[in-house]
């Protein structure tokens, strides 16, 4: 993977498949990131899921939102092409994200957090409320949420299942095993391979384990007072999320003062990828 320091005032690419990878030094970490879409307006910062690097974002979702908004994605500390040791708490990851955002010179952003990224987004909104304008939380849950402390077991089980069946574990973790779910998984994984040049580094086993510990701790924490989150929030999930149980999305919607909830039928953790066309439409209407 080739990374370059981002030039000031660089033109933004509007295709995720060809968006160049840049780096920026912030807080002693060299963060790898990509950006595309319009050069003006409030940017949407994407916060990644467990074990994810830049190339794990669905091109249809990125390009869809980038059609109207500047999109910025980055590798968490210690993941992919970003330097440093992977944090073992969601709190540290949230601080890293704020450091990265401020290093790019932004005073206000929108956040799209998927799974672990949604946990990070919640903390940013609580700790740095002036930084966040709006927030999309997909396939995620609050601190102490139902079944979140079981993500480690489910992840290891489905990783082993993937090895035994020679399939990508995301087929089991993100999608239902119905005909619709299987078809959506196949299409999603094919889209992840559309970018052929300048691909990111896969996450290391050490980083993966550190992230699992962070999620486990999040699942065991005392519930936070989400009434303090005053920003508009779009909560999205599949009706059958077995990784971060769907009840957590319902709980978020109930506890957040200004939220709306979308649950996709016959869909699991990766509902936003299975129903990417509808999700992008709703996201653009919300942002």
Please name every model-derived segment.
Residues 242-248:
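Conserved alpha/beta-hydrolase "acid-adjacent" motif
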Residues 126, 133-165:
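Flexible "cap/lid" loop of the alpha/beta hydrolase fold
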Residues 264-280:
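Catalytic histidine-centered segment of alpha/beta-hydrolase-like enzymes
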Residues 72-112, 281:
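Active-site loop/oxyanion-hole signature of alpha/beta-hydrolase fold enzymes
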Residues 229, 235-237, 241:
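Short beta-strand/loop motif that positions the catalytic acidic residue
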Residues 27-83:
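Conserved HGGG/HGGXW glycine-rich cap/lid loop of the alpha/beta-hydrolase fold
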